[in-house]
Amino acid sequence: MELPNIMHPVAKLSTALAAALMLSGCMPGEIRPTIGQQMETGDQRFGDLVFRQLAPNVWQHTSYLDMPGFGAVASNGLIVRDGGRVLVVDTAWTDDQTAQILNWIKQEINLPVALAVVTHAHQDKMGGMDALHAAGIATYANALSNQLAPQEGMVAAQHSLTFAANGWVEPATAPNFGPLKVFYPGPGHTSDNITVGIDGTDIAFGGCLIKDSKAKSLGNLGDADTEHYAASARAFGAAFPKASMIVMSHSAPDSRAAITHTARMADKLR
């Protein structure tokens, strides 16, 4: 439902930076919902952001970037309560927005944020690293993401995740991750994209790899591995076979049909 009289303040982006983001990050064309369409009953506005509870201990955070010529572009991540602490998946677009996520956690959950894991080296996932570091939060990313971060204009995470041949994170590199089950499905949207399942729930986060079940395209393929995209999407589905709620970066949560549809679109790239 459109909410024409409700406008979010969103991060501003220069035309030059917008062009760079379209080349190196997620294209606006892959991001279908308007702000009004993204908001649903029960969503909570907090400053520039929107928060949606997905499960008793899981919330989706949504931030917006004002991209000239395209309007407000939404990006989603997760907040997970694990006993007496909080875990975060992905930053917002900017440091200021990421600080708002931390403020919301303080106000609504009032538990310390123990760590954050980011799912690849683009601004929508990694643009708020300085805010996390300023708050003393341990940050983790795929080792390849940390390698790519400087050339993407991003700040690298403090710790690098490595992965076994079967795609699962090496436990020694992901200490105290609790319910976060981190999986590298193979290259797809980017060479470094990782995914996260939430143990004890029916939720799996596909990040920018997975598109919703009504998507018309896979969006920006500038950094994509078109040869392996379909296999990587299917590997994500196989890694989390019991997940019935698929959360992704640029659409509302969907069913497993999102995985099937993404893989079928990617089949056409080969």
From Swiss-Prot:
One of its GO terms (cellular component) is periplasmic space. Its EC number is 3.5.2.6. It is an enzyme of class 3 (hydrolase). Residues 1-28 form the signal peptide. It catalyses: a beta-lactam + H2O = a substituted beta-amino acid. Keywords: Antibiotic resistance, Hydrolase, Metal-binding, Periplasm, Plasmid, Signal, Zinc. Binds 2 Zn(2+) ions per subunit. One of its GO terms (biological process) is antibiotic catabolic process. InterPro entries: Metallo-B-lactamas, NDM-1-like, RibonucZ/Hydroxyglut_hydro. It is found in: Periplasm. Zn(2+) 2 binds at residues 124, 208, 250. Inhibits by captopril, thiorphan, dimercaprol and tiopronin. This enzyme is not susceptible to inactivation by the beta-lactamase-blocking agents clavulanic acid. SMART domains: Lactamase_B. Zn(2+) 1 binds at residues 120, 122, 189. Pfam families: Lactamase_B (PF00753). Its cofactor is Zn(2+). Monomer. Belongs to the metallo-beta-lactamase superfamily. Class-B beta-lactamase family. Confers resistance to the different beta-lactams antibiotics (penicillin, cephalosporin and carbapenem) via the hydrolysis of the beta-lactam ring. Does not confer resistance to the polymixin colistin or the fluoroquinolone ciprofloxacin. This is Metallo-beta-lactamase type 2. It comes from Klebsiella pneumoniae. The lineage of its organism: Bacteria, Pseudomonadati, Pseudomonadota, Gammaproteobacteria, Enterobacterales. The gene is blaNDM-1.
